[in-house]
From Swiss-Prot:
Zinc finger (B box-type) boundaries: 117-159
Occurrences of domain COS (ranges): 267-325
Function statement: E3 ubiquitin ligase. Mediates the ubiquitination and subsequent proteasomal degradation of CKM, GMEB1 and HIBADH. Regulates the proteasomal degradation of muscle proteins under amino acid starvation, where muscle protein is catabolized to provide other organs with amino acids. Inhibits de novo skeletal muscle protein synthesis under amino acid starvation. Regulates proteasomal degradation of cardiac troponin I/TNNI3 and probably of other sarcomeric-associated proteins. May play a role in striated muscle atrophy and hypertrophy by regulating an anti-hypertrophic PKC-mediated signaling pathway.
Cited PANTHER family: E3 UBIQUITIN-PROTEIN LIGASE TRIM36-RELATED, TRIPARTITE MOTIF CONTAINING 55
Sorted UniProt keywords: Coiled coil, Cytoplasm, Metal-binding, Muscle protein, Nucleus, Transferase, Ubl conjugation pathway, Zinc, Zinc-finger
UniProt effect for mutating T232M: Rare variant; found in a patient with hypertrophic cardiomyopathy; uncertain significance
Protein name, UniProt field: E3 ubiquitin-protein ligase TRIM63
Top-level lineage group: Eukaryota
Pathway: Protein modification; protein ubiquitination
Length: 353
């Protein structure tokens, strides 16, 4: 964590320092002990343990007598995969530097007088700060508006209580959206595997088909090209469908990621009023985005290409009529041949009589 460069970027070093000391999980100042991940991001050890336990539900605690092989989870900041040994998060190194900075920061804050920060003012009463929230109109306002102004008949609540409530709701929405992004990423991985298996299966049936045609290549050369083309068309059709799905899910993931970034930036607003001016619409957008992820998927057995297999146990006169078929069609063909042979035999016997 580059604290020096972060502090230089703005004119208020203490506010910037406080932002650097916020845990991305609990959204509060780091609680000691603070652990540092391999990707160099920091977490409260309690928060790190919470997400580790959520990602590894069958991992037992440090005091268990059962020998565990460890587990893994993703850094909430950069999504880098963190691999743990059998000690879990207790095997992570403590960031003593950050802990010392937190102590110094708290001492500095306790010794400094409260400073007047920027606070939104009421548009109707320019000398009044926005300090209450109108529940009826769902907007922040000032006390004068409640006593004498347009919100006189409205129901109001303390700004801080509404701020905390909507902040909690937004946190829950972010968690829900992040979980949805993980599911989308899983689907993308599955689709990529599906694409690979489809290619492998297509290659396999092509090889099998080529080997069977080699025995009768002189007769089947033209037919061979035709059937291979059909397999290729089916492969391209399936791969085009899968590629389109991957692109749709990737676009959904990109939109969700941008929305998460916007929401996290909104959480960094130091004042409740500024936050509440945009929080309602932001929460609505996140909920709609979470409900809107209704994209298509491949059906079970989509990658299967077995219906292109061929059995070349046919007489030479039937070679030019060969096509991909089912077992039932082949059985009917055999039954028709047997019936023709029986009729021919019966006719010969009647002729001898």
């Amino acid at each position: 964590m580059d604290y020096k460069s972060s502090l230089i970027q703005d004119g208020n070093p203490m506010e910037n320092l406080e932002k650097q000391l916020i845990c991305p999980i609990c959204l509060e100042m780091f609680t000691k002990p603070v652990v540092i991940l391999p990707c160099q991001h920091n977490l409260c050890r309690k928060c790190a343990n919470d997400i580790f336990q959520a990602a590894n539900p069958y991992w037992t605690s440090r005091g268990s007598s059962v020998s565990m092989s460890g587990g893994r989870f993703r850094c909430p900041t950069c999504r880098h995969e963190v691999i743990m040994d059998r000690h879990g998060v207790y095997g992570l190194q403590r960031n003593l530097l950050v802990e010392n900075i937190i102590d110094i920061y708290k001492q500095e804050c306790s010794s400094r007088p409260l400073q007047k920060g920027s606070h939104p003012m009421c548009k109707e009463h320019e000398d009044e700060k926005i300090n209450i929230y109108c529940l009826t109109c769902e907007v922040p306002t000032c006390s004068m508006c409640k006593v004498f102004g347009i919100h006189k008949a409205c129901e109001v609540a303390p700004l801080q209580s509404v701020f905390q409530g909507q902040k909690t709701e937004l946190n829950n929405c972010i968690s829900m959206l992040v979980a949805g992004n993980d599911r989308v990423q899983t689907i993308i991985t599955q689709l990529e595997d599906s694409r690979r298996v489809t290619k492998e299966n297509s290659h396999q049936v092509k090889e099998e088909l080529s080997q069977k045609f080699d025995t009768l290549y002189a007769i089947l050369d033209e037919k061979k090209s035709e059937l291979l083309q059909r397999i290729t068309q089916e492969q391209e059709k399936k791969l085009s469908f899968i590629e389109a799905l991957i692109q749709q899910y990737q676009e959904q993931l990109d939109k969700s990621t941008k929305l998460v970034e916007t929401a996290i930036q909104s959480l960094d607003e130091p004042g409740g009023a500024t936050f509440l001016l945009t929080a309602k619409q932001l929460i609505k957008s996140i909920v709609e985005a979470s409900k809107g992820c209704q994209l298509g998927k491949t059906e079970q057995g989509f990658e299967n290409m077995d219906f292109f297999t061929l059995d070349l146990e046919h007489i030479a006169d039937a070679l030019r009529a060969i096509d991909f078929g089912t077992d039932e069609e082949e059985e009917e063909f055999i039954e028709e041949e047997d019936q023709e042979e029986e009729e021919s035999t019966e006719g010969k016997e009647e002729g001898h009589q």
